[in-house]
Amino acid sequence: MKLLSNSLMFLPLLALALTAVSSLKYSRNDFPPGFVFGSGTSAYQVEGAADEDGRTPSIWDVFAHAGHSGVAAGNVACDQYHKYKEDVKLMADMGLEAYRFSISWSRLLPSGRGPINPKGLQYYNNLIDELITHGIQPHVTLHHFDLPQALEDEYGGWLSQEIVRDFTAYADTCFKEFGDRVSHWTTINEVNVFALGGYDQGITPPARCSPPFGLNCTKGNSSIEPYIAVHNMLLAHASATILYKQQYKVLLSASLPSSICIAFCYVLFITQYKQHGSVGISVYTYGAVPLTNSVKDKQATARVNDFYIGWILHPLVFGDYPETMKTNVGSRLPAFTEEESEQVKGAFDFVGVINYMALYVKDNSSSLKPNLQDFNTDIAVEMTLVGNTSIENEYANTPWSLQQILLYVKETYGNPPVYILENGQMTPHSSSLVDTTRVKYLSSYIKAVLHSLSRKGSDVKGYFQWSLMDVFELFGGYERSFGLLYVDFKDPSLKRSPKLSAHWYSSFLKGTLHHPSYASS
């Protein structure tokens, strides 16, 4: 199925879409050499084959089968496990330069540790090789809401520091098996959202929470568990990053005596030559603005940035949590030992930014008074989404929010390299293939990235649209869509069809859009 084989049908609509975004004066050539454009998915949302070839359940399997995503689950999803060649061909036809996907930990290591599943290993080798054959960079996420259920059952998953050992061993396996072809690694997806949804509100795996903060809570403690989970995720991320730098990236042979280097260093040099990648972490962000110009609302907005972004990035840059968090959360916030602080500080090569929406922020300091506390009372704000936005509606088009986040990361954390790992527009799955709102959204946000890069000096390295195709969504199952490609979930073959946004993105990437140059505008 060649992507542009039905371009003639879409030409009038593409022209209409271009008219709608005619004020966005930029082209692919305005971005610097080395900047990559891609799209993304995650394992449970797209692979299917949930019970095939040795894969065992993850916490997302259990979550979905408990009915948390309605009646749907990811047992089949888009069946990329069997259709990866077709999907990579569609990516190549579209002109994608990179594909962000995640590895299913429980497909590769069915027990969470120990022996590798040969069929799982073969699948990811095949996918990576197919991408490279078509000139597409593989960008790999190691954990995307899908911890092996075996580890959750054994010791409580991310609530136990035992997870640091097992995650590091899992990362080591991935670096060893795929690192000769994969140069971009994200350890954990949306650390903050995973912790809040899974351990405070109970609306994402593993669905832990406590009243009155969560919904239908049967286990958990919303007051402390989110903070414990993030603490252990940061330690696990740091451990994996240090492992990569010490065993797969840093050349150690120079310090070895020549007498033992003859036999040993040859192997070492071969290994190190192939390992030249970078390791980062992913953070969900909101573009936050004060509801009023009052001092309290401005301070509240600063707290939102501290609690959502600083919760993750502050330890990685400065070795500790933000002072506002330590003050408001108190003893419920785990403390880094001196050794742990040294380990997490600097343990990243890039920051993965995820951004969809913007917030108005109002001070609510009175929420600090109750005896029962959780993240939402600790942050002490009232937040309202900008525009007519909810998980039920299309997102408001607020590209300034992404610009704001990129500027904040630059100014607060020393302008680290950044990849936009997710950004996209939601529509009902039943909506038309003529997704003009998605075209407008993507074109606006891509221009915002260019502005942040060329006018503000943010060190942005790439942009990944979410998602490549309609997938099994965490909120809404198959009823909500972010895809460039429509997937007919009622068709046994799960037919893929390019939407208008796919044609627009393809035209942009191939340089066939005729916007005036941003540099000359």
Swiss-Prot record:
Cited Pfam families: Glyco_hydro_1
Entry-linked InterPro entries: Glyco_hydro_1 (IPR001360), Glyco_hydro_1_N_CS (IPR033132), Glycoside_hydrolase_SF (IPR017853)
Catalytic activity: Hydrolysis of terminal, non-reducing beta-D-glucosyl residues with release of beta-D-glucose
EC number(s) per entry: 3.2.1.21
Record GO terms (molecular function): beta-glucosidase activity
Gene3D superfamilies found in the cross-reference section: Glycosidases
Position of the signal peptide: 1-23
PROSITE patterns: GLYCOSYL_HYDROL_F1_2
Disulphide bridges: C209-C217
Glycosylated residues, chain numbering: N216, N221, N364, N388
Keywords: Disulfide bond, Glycoprotein, Glycosidase, Hydrolase, Signal
GO BP annotations listed: carbohydrate metabolic process
Residue numbers binding a beta-D-glucoside: Q45, H144, N189, E190, Y356, E422, W466, F482
Active site: E190 (proton donor), E422 (nucleophile)
Family: Belongs to the glycosyl hydrolase 1 family.
Protein's UniProt name: Beta-glucosidase 11
